[in-house]
């Protein structure tokens, strides 16, 4: 191997290691058997959620996992492997990939890194069932609005009852 090739691969290992460290979620999948159309659809869904999916050679992923301090992640890098990286929402990649796997049997979740910790398949599947950040924020907003709304309805009902009594 030439020195240039080695330098390029070392640079790629650095980039992937940094991406692993900076992502709140990096989910590893086996995409063997997916059609081009399915992969395109999956990438589109991930992109809409702000998630980037990359196909990276296993040797590079193993070295990057080592460099990033995720040695326990190395066993999942066997066979055709893709990694979905999210820098904002730790739930989005797991949720999208798990939902996609329900319709595309060929896609298999393997594990990943979630919020700085190596996650096995079971943990990834648990995250896939959690509500997303946006869903949680909407729920909190509704909970905060409910008391105000209830008071407004009560005041309106009292006012209407007062109008009926006056008539």
Curated annotation (Swiss-Prot):
Pfam families: Ribosomal_L10. Keywords: Ribonucleoprotein, Ribosomal protein, RNA-binding, rRNA-binding. InterPro entries: Ribosomal_uL10 (IPR001790), Ribosomal_uL10-like_sf (IPR043141), Ribosomal_uL10_bac (IPR022973), Ribosomal_uL10_bac_type (IPR047865), Ribosomal_uL10_CS_bac (IPR002363). GO terms for biological process: translation. One of its GO terms (molecular function) is large ribosomal subunit rRNA binding. GO terms for cellular component: large ribosomal subunit. Part of the ribosomal stalk of the 50S ribosomal subunit. The N-terminus interacts with L11 and the large rRNA to form the base of the stalk. The C-terminus forms an elongated spine to which L12 dimers bind in a sequential fashion forming a multimeric L10(L12)X complex. Forms part of the ribosomal stalk, playing a central role in the interaction of the ribosome with GTP-bound translation factors. Belongs to the universal ribosomal protein uL10 family. This is Large ribosomal subunit protein uL10.
């Amino acid at each position: 191997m030439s020195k240039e090739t080695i330098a390029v691969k070392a640079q790629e290992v650095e980039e992937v290691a940094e991406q692993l460290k900076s992502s709140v979620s990096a989910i590893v999948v086996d995409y063997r058997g997916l059609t081009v159309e399915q992969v395109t659809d999956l990438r589109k869904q991930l992109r809409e959620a702000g998630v980037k999916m990359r196909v990276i050679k296993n040797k590079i992923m193993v070295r990057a996992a080592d460099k990033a301090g995720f040695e326990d992640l190395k066993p999942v890098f066997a066979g055709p492997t893709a990694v979905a990286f999210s820098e904002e929402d730790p739930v989005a990649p797991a949720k999208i990939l798990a939902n996609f796997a329900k319709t595309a049997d060929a896609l298999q979740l393997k594990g990943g890194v979630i919020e700085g910790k190596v996650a096995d398949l079971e943990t990834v599947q648990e995250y896939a069932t959690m509500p997303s950040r946006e869903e949680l924020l909407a729920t909190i907003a509704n909970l905060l609005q409910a008391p105000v709304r209830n008071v407004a309805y009560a005041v309106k009902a009292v006012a209407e009852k007062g109008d009926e009594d006056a008539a």
